[in-house]
């Protein structure tokens, strides 16, 4: 992973090029240094105790329109997005192998070890109209951490690459249903009339994609916990800083600390 300006962190582990075909959408955020060293097990244990409101607010914190909505509006939108993800997962065969589902959808799935020529860590990526890439080095590192840190009891035994692929399948679904699916059709007015500019809320697709992946793979926790786990495989300090940022939402009464 390329470290830039001390502590810049890739804050969304799934790549998605629906917004601009052929280009990676890499969102970076300046992170504070972690306050203290923490074990990966303790961080995972705490993250698993957080309720959906924390994860929805975390997703919103990455959205360019975050400052235009109240907390209540963000949570309401988050609930609707999660419901959208669940509903779309229900339309597919639950419990089926996600790789078989991808094949039935006519997708071209490639599994290189790392991105070619990229300086940032990308874990998975969808390129319109039908190409998905899962970068296996990051999945391998995460699986090794699960084994070495004895996290199976917390995270289960679902392969990390399956969860990555499932999330990208939602973005494929978004593309194919862009005229009807909630995460694509819901827009907000940014300018007052007569100068109209209606914009999509990007984080809704990420919230829905996480819930879609959870339902489709049957994992017992939100895939959002993999943000910290997979970053830990490359940079322990950056992962700990990200954990503390997420935990702060719960500390502000925006979730339960457990």
What are these regions (language model features)?
Residues 1-137, 141-143, 148-150:
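A metal-dependent hydrolase signature that marks the N-terminal structural subdomain at the beginning
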Residues 70, 95-97, 156, 160, ...:
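Secondary-structure junction/capping motif
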Residues 92, 126-128, 155-159, 163, ...:
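Alpha-helix initiation and capping sites
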Residues 109, 134, 165-170, 226:
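Generic structural hydrophobic/aromatic packing signal, biased to beta-strands
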Residues 127-145, 156, 177-183, 187-188, ...:
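Conserved binding/catalytic microenvironments
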Residues 142-164:
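Short pre-active-site segment immediately N-terminal to the catalytic Zn-binding motif
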Residues 163-180:
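Active-site recognition of the HExxH zinc-binding catalytic motif
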Residues 185-258:
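Metalloprotease/metallohydrolase-associated module, dominated by Zn2+-dependent proteases
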């Amino acid at each position: 992973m390329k470290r830039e300006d001390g502590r810049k962190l890739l804050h969304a582990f799934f790549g998605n090029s629906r917004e601009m075909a052929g280009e990676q959408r890499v969102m970076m955020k300046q992170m504070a240094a972690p306050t203290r060293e923490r074990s990966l097990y303790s961080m995972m244990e705490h993250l698993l105790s957080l309720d959906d409101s924390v994860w929805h607010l975390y997703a919103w914190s990455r959205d360019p329109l975050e400052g235009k909505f109240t907390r209540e509006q963000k949570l309401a939108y988050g609930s609707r997005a999660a419901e959208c993800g669940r509903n779309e997962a229900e339309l597919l065969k639950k419990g089926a192998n996600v790789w078989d589902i991808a094949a039935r959808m006519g997708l071209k799935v490639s599994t290189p070890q790392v991105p070619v020529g990229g300086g940032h860590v990308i874990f998975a990526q969808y390129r319109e109209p039908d190409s998905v890439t899962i970068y296996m080095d990051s999945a391998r590192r995460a699986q090794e951490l699960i084994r070495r840190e004895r996290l199976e009891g917390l995270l289960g035994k679902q392969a990390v690459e399956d969860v990555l692929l499932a999330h990208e399948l939602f973005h494929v679904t978004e593309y194919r249903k862009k005229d009807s699916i909630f995460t694509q059709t819901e827009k907000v007015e940014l300018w007052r009339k007569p100068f109209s500019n209606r914009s999509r809320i990007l984080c809704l697709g990420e919230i829905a994609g996480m819930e879609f992946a959870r339902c489709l793979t049957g994992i017992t926790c939100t895939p959002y916990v993999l943000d910290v786990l997979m970053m830990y495989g490359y940079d322990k300090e950056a992962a700990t800083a990200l954990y503390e940022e997420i935990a702060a939402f719960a500390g502000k009464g925006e979730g339960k600390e457990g």
